[in-house]
């Protein structure tokens, strides 16, 4: 009986010293599956946190950030920048600059601009064709019916290249009629003697108007130069500067 009592007492002592199986943060089964080697884990893992098949963060199959299947940034399937499937293949590019239309580059010579190929002549601004009476009803009617075929701009050189108005007007009429005739004839239209006579009258009036306009502008430019070159004005400008 004594031997049986001692054996029973020894078994009870060993049970008290034996660690409990399982439990939180012990060597047994653990939940979630984070533990020391040898413990049972649920679910089976390869060394990462809960729901980490390959060692990444929550919901990371291959070690990237949240929602990153292969280690890129948010919404990056293969490691590129935002919205990039892989590398720089799908990067955003700036749109090409719109090409300038030829309509914006082409155009007639501007009023007062030097016309290339005419030896320094300039093209004046468009004018209304003057109402001219030629002394008989036939020519007056002919002019009214055909005036749209005649020039409404004149070619001229700067007024300071001429000694008087007559020289300016004579040169202006000749070059204008010549250019208009050549251009119009190239298009298949011919002028009669009556047309040439009427064009000379029309262009002469427009050349006189152009001379008066250019002379006034030239005089104003000269007056401005004289004003700003006077000693009092120069002294005032120097003081202001």
UniProtKB/Swiss-Prot annotation:
- Residues of the propeptide: 224-241
Q: Which GO terms describe its biological process?
A: protein homooligomerization
Region annotation (Interaction with GRB2, ERI3 and SYN1) maps to 16-223
Glycosylation annotated at which residues? 174, 190
Q: Give a yes or no for keyword rRNA-binding in this entry.
A: no
According to its record, what are the GO cellular component terms? Golgi apparatus; plasma membrane; side of membrane
Give the main localization category. Answer: membrane
GO molecular function (one): copper ion binding
Name the residues that bind Cu(2+) 4.
78-80
- Report the Gene3D superfamilies cross-referenced here: Prion/Doppel protein, beta-ribbon domain
**Residues that bind Cu(2+) 2, according to the entry?**
62-64
Name the residues that bind Cu(2+) 1.
54-56
Q: Where is this region: Interaction with ADGRG6?
A: 16-31
| Region named Disordered | 18-101
Question: What membrane topology does the annotation report for this chain?
Answer: Lipid-anchor; GPI-anchor
Among the Pfam families in the record, one is: Prion_octapep
Q: Which residues does the annotated region (5 X 8 AA tandem repeats of P-H-G-G-G-W-G-Q) include? A: 44-84
- What disorder does this protein's entry note? PrP is found in high quantity in the brain of humans and animals infected with the degenerative neurological diseases kuru, Creutzfeldt-Jakob disease (CJD), Gerstmann-Straussler syndrome (GSS), scrapie, bovine spongiform encephalopathy (BSE), transmissible mink encephalopathy (TME), etc.
State whether it acts alone or in a complex, and with which partners, per the record: Monomer and homodimer. Has a tendency to aggregate into amyloid fibrils containing a cross-beta spine, formed by a steric zipper of superposed beta-strands. Soluble oligomers may represent an intermediate stage on the path to fibril formation. Copper binding may promote oligomerization. Interacts with GRB2, APP, ERI3/PRNPIP and SYN1. Mislocalized cytosolically exposed PrP interacts with MGRN1; this interaction alters MGRN1 subcellular location and causes lysosomal enlargement. Interacts with APP. Interacts with KIAA1191. Interacts with ADGRG6.
The protein's job, in short, is: Its primary physiological function is unclear. May play a role in neuronal development and synaptic plasticity. May be required for neuronal myelin sheath maintenance. May promote myelin homeostasis through acting as an agonist for ADGRG6 receptor. May play a role in iron uptake and iron homeostasis. Soluble oligomers are toxic to cultured neuroblastoma cells and induce apoptosis (in vitro). Association with GPC1 (via its heparan sulfate chains) targets PRNP to lipid rafts. Also provides Cu(2+) or Zn(2+) for the ascorbate-mediated GPC1 deaminase degradation of its heparan sulfate side chains.
**Domain remarks in the entry?**
The normal, monomeric form has a mainly alpha-helical structure. The disease-associated, protease-resistant form forms amyloid fibrils containing a cross-beta spine, formed by a steric zipper of superposed beta-strands. Disease mutations may favor intermolecular contacts via short beta strands, and may thereby trigger oligomerization. Contains an N-terminal region composed of octamer repeats. At low copper concentrations, the sidechains of His residues from three or four repeats contribute to the binding of a single copper ion. Alternatively, a copper ion can be bound by interaction with the sidechain and backbone amide nitrogen of a single His residue. The observed copper binding stoichiometry suggests that two repeat regions cooperate to stabilize the binding of a single copper ion. At higher copper concentrations, each octamer can bind one copper ion by interactions with the His sidechain and Gly backbone atoms.
What protein name does the entry list? Major prion protein
Which organism encodes this protein?
Mandrillus sphinx
């Amino acid at each position: 009986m004594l031997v049986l009592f001692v054996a029973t007492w020894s078994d009870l002592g060993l049970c008290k010293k034996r660690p409990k199986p399982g439990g939180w943060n012990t060597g047994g089964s653990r939940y979630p599956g984070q533990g020391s080697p040898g413990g049972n884990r649920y679910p089976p893992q390869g060394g990462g946190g809960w729901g980490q098949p390959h060692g990444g963060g929550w919901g990371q199959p291959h070690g990237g950030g949240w929602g990153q299947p292969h280690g890129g940034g948010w919404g990056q399937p293969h490691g590129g920048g935002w919205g990039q499937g892989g590398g720089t293949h799908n990067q955003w590019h700036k749109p090409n600059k719109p090409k300038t239309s030829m309509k914006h580059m082409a155009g007639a010579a501007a009023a007062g601009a030097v016309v290339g190929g005419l030896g320094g002549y300039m093209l004046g601004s468009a004018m209304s064709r003057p109402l001219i009476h030629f002394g008989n009803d036939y020519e007056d009617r002919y002019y009214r019916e055909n005036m749209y075929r005649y020039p409404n701009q004149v070619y001229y050189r700067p007024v300071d290249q001429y000694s008087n108005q007559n020289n300016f007007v004579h040169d202006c009429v000749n070059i204008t009629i010549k250019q208009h005739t050549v251009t119009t004839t190239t298009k298949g239209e011919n002028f009669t003697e009556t047309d040439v006579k009427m064009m000379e009258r029309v262009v002469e009036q427009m050349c006189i108007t152009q001379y008066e306009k250019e002379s006034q502008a030239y005089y104003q430019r000269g007056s401005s130069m004289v004003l700003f070159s006077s000693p009092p004005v120069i002294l005032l400008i120097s003081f202001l500067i």
